[in-house]
Amino acid sequence: GAISLLRGGLSEGLRFPDFEKALTRCALAHYNDFGHSLIYTSKAAVLIDRLGESVATPLLLSLVRSLVYATREDLIPQFRRYGEALDRWGERGNRDSVSADDLMGMGVNQALDLTGDACRAPVIELYDALLGANAQNMLAYDLYYQNQTHRPVQDNVGWLDFSHGLTFANAVRLQCTKFPELWPQG
């Protein structure tokens, strides 16, 4: 399957940049692995650049294997409407702009609806609004919630939720700047 195709491409002399768009598209599919797939894809390029081509094959094999086995987060209740929102991207578009303040206090479904409604806005404006909302949530974070382990998983919030959001946002910006048609998935 995927590993065989990768090995074939590598044996033909293809390198990471030749695979990067397909890997990015795969990483963004279904909000795979809560965004970790995209983070790993963006960091693979950095590692290969810093450590040299000798690490490319084992790194690509590991990355592709992780993409094949990635969990589809669009199947869990909190993110179930993600696929529908992507399918409808560009259909609504009745807002020309969105800000971080517009997103404050929203749940996942409300945020999906709002970003879908604002799909005509410049993508970097949508990105900045989502990143800004994450930053505002971080500033207003109450440690009380982190210590409430008796609550349902969706109500457990810790510092990892914020730092992961920032790391994922950075990966989205890096990869979607290279491949702009993938911004809606990011």
Question: Model-found features: residue ranges?
Answer:
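Mature, well-folded catalytic/scaffold domains that follow N-terminal targeting or propeptide regions
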Residues: 1-186
